[in-house]
Amino acid sequence: MRAFKVTRDTNETKIHLELNIDGTGKYAITTGIAFFDHVLSSFAKHGAFDLKLDVLGDLEIDDHHTVEDVGIVLGKAFENMEKKNIKRFGWAIIPMDEAKASVSVDIGGRPYVVGDYTPSTEKIGNFSTENVVHFFESFSNNAKINLHFEVTGENEHHKVEALFKAFGVAMDMATQIDERKGIVSTKGVI
């Protein structure tokens, strides 16, 4: 079983995360940001990852530190994963009503994000939409994965939710075990 626990305790956030990559999509998520809980739940459900996440953040300031640090901790959990025999690459195109999101990932040890997301509103509930790209940058830098995404649509809720669902599906695909593969790199290491 590929299960990991990661904690982060700073002056800005206190986070405890438990991730089972070989899960069934069970989740218990409390960040203090209702919409962020919602899209992280969608990530876990559609990625078939069991995810438990308890966060106490400095939300009296704003949601930036909480969103950033969740990306860091979730990224570290995936970075801890054994890379031997994984498929390495994953992708998904997910519609949600008028919105469509595409995500492709490479778990190749090279962090890089290319994202096309322009929010039309500043907030969804108490979640700042400017933090969407920053979440993925924080995740990618700590998971050491290459991540590309694009989002189109009109409704901001639909756009961000479709993006997190596509992220879950792409990560599920990339983390699947294929015994034929060994280390999926001509270098011999990831």
Curated annotation (Swiss-Prot):
GO BP annotation list: L-histidine biosynthetic process
E.C. numbers: 4.2.1.19
Pathway: Amino-acid biosynthesis; L-histidine biosynthesis; L-histidine from 5-phospho-alpha-D-ribose 1-diphosphate: step 6/9
Cross-referenced InterPro entries: IGPD_sf (IPR038494), ImidazoleglycerolP_deHydtase (IPR000807), ImidazoleglycerP_deHydtase_CS (IPR020565), Ribosomal_Su5_D2-typ_SF (IPR020568)
Localisation: Cytoplasm
Keywords, sorted A to Z: Amino-acid biosynthesis, Cytoplasm, Histidine biosynthesis, Lyase
CDD domains: IGPD
GO molecular function, one term: imidazoleglycerol-phosphate dehydratase activity
GO cellular component: cytoplasm
Top EC class, one word: lyase
Gene3D superfamilies attached to this UniProt entry: Imidazole glycerol phosphate dehydratase, domain 1 (3.30.230.40)
Reaction(s) the record says it catalyses: D-erythro-1-(imidazol-4-yl)glycerol 3-phosphate = 3-(imidazol-4-yl)-2-oxopropyl phosphate + H2O
Family: Belongs to the imidazoleglycerol-phosphate dehydratase family.
The name this protein goes by in its record: Imidazoleglycerol-phosphate dehydratase
